């Protein structure tokens, strides 16, 4: 395997010059630079990424910690981040916590050892101790969506409260007064805010919130299926259900279908996230849209900005996105 000394010998220059050409850390004459690159190509020399990172104090790599990359919502964000990393010349280390808090420390330790230039966090499992340890490394961090507030990190917020309010308000405007909820974990910030938005819209319309119509699970379709079946055992049913994710809505619609009930004739359903497949549900799902690609790209751009500037002069920022209602065919208008 060729070494930097072999390249220097073939190009007729010093190893220091080869290093400057590779890392672009000093001006090198065009003819000399060409000789070095010709030698690199001829010898099939591959510089050590670790050695280069020590020279230029960058690894051109980003870490991303998320709850799970399998869920459609997260998958769409990861895809956008990965593509933008590629366009900017960065590699991406993807770490899934799978809702297991103990994994967060192992992932953070690994990313520190990999000397990543920055980290995107999109999970709610990390602890204050973990953050303090990570902040001690001075590695820039951007917290996306689900994350807790932190004085050292930028935050990208999806405004789940506003989204929960919009979803419920749409049901009310379509004449629904008996409205239920199938939520994700209400201990999670995202679910809690959507539920608070639901409550605000209900209270403004002077509509009662019936606790027997409030169901809590996770964000998977199996949870939507199970909780809808639990709801259907009740004597009195709501006319509409606000599902806290499109995947929950998928399970809920499936449960209704198995009971011979149709959406929206027998029960209206509104989802949240506007994942790619939601337009192909039967019926196409009315939902709350938040641009996953825009969220991912914005978070990465902020992180890259932090990486490039003096950390002592940077003030963490909070950026909010505003959700939008996407009208399809899963909500019945009872006013007609």
UniProtKB/Swiss-Prot annotation:
Binding site for hypoxanthine: 73, 188, 219, 273
InterPro entries: HTH_LacI, Lambda_DNA-bd_dom_sf, Peripla_BP/Lac1_sug-bd_dom, Peripla_BP_I, Tscrpt_reg_HTH_PurR
Pfam (any one): Peripla_BP_1
Recorded GO MF terms: DNA-binding transcription factor activity; transcription cis-regulatory region binding
A GO biological-process term: negative regulation of DNA-templated transcription
Keywords associated with the record: DNA-binding, Purine biosynthesis, Repressor, Transcription, Transcription regulation
Pathway, per record: Purine metabolism; purine nucleotide biosynthesis [regulation]
DNA-binding region listed in the record: 4-23, 48-56
Keyword Signal applies: no
The keyword Chaperone appears for this protein: no
Domain HTH lacI-type per the UniProt entry, residue ranges: 2-56
HAMAP family for this protein: HTH_type_PurR
Reported function: Is the main repressor of the genes involved in the de novo synthesis of purine nucleotides, regulating purB, purC, purEK, purF, purHD, purL, purMN and guaBA expression. PurR is allosterically activated to bind its cognate DNA by binding the purine corepressors, hypoxanthine or guanine, thereby effecting transcription repression.
Notes on the domains: Consists of two structural and functional domains: an N-terminal DNA-binding domain, approximately the first 60 residues, and a larger C-terminal domain, approximately 280 residues, which imparts the function of corepressor binding and oligomerization.
Subunit structure: Homodimer.
Protein name per its UniProtKB record: HTH-type transcriptional repressor PurR
């Amino acid at each position: 395997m060729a070494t930097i000394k072999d390249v220097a010998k073939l190009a007729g220059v010093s190893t220091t010059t080869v290093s400057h050409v590779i890392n672009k850390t000093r001006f090198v004459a065009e003819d000399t630079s060409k000789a070095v690159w010709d030698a690199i190509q001829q010898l099939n020399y591959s510089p050590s990424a670790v050695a280069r990172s020590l020279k230029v104090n960058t690894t051109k790599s980003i870490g991303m910690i998320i709850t799970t990359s399998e869920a459609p919502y997260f998958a769409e964000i990861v895809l956008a981040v990965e593509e933008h990393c590629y366009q900017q010349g960065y590699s991406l280390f993807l770490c899934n916590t799978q809702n297991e808090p103990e994994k967060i420390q192992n992932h953070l330790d690994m990313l520190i050892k990999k000397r990543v230039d920055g980290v995107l966090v999109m999970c709610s499992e990390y602890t204050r101790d973990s953050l303090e340890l990570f902040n001690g490394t001075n590695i820039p961090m951007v917290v996306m969506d689900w994350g807790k507030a932190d004085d050292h990190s930028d935050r990208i917020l999806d405004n789940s409260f506003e989204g929960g309010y919009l979803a419920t308000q749409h049901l009310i405007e379509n004449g629904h007064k008996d409205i239920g909820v199938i939520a994700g974990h209400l201990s999670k910030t995202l679910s809690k805010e959507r539920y608070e938005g639901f409550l605000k819209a209900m209270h403004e319309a002077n509509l009662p919130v019936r606790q027997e119509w409030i169901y809590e699970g996770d964000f998977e379709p199996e949870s939507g299926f199970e909780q809808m079946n639990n709801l259907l055992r009740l004597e009195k049913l709501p006319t509409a259900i606000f599902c806290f994710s499109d995947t929950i809505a998928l399970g809920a619609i499936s449960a209704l279908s198995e009971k011979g009930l149709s959406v929206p004739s027998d029960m209206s359903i509104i989802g949240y996230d506007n994942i790619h497949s939601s337009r192909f549900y039967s019926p196409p799902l009315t939902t709350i849209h938040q641009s996953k690609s825009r969220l991912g790209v914005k978070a990465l751009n902020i992180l890259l900005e932090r990486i490039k500037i003096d950390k002592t002069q940077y003030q963490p920022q909070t950026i909010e996105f505003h959700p939008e209602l996407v009208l399809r065919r899963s909500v019945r208008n009872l006013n007609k």
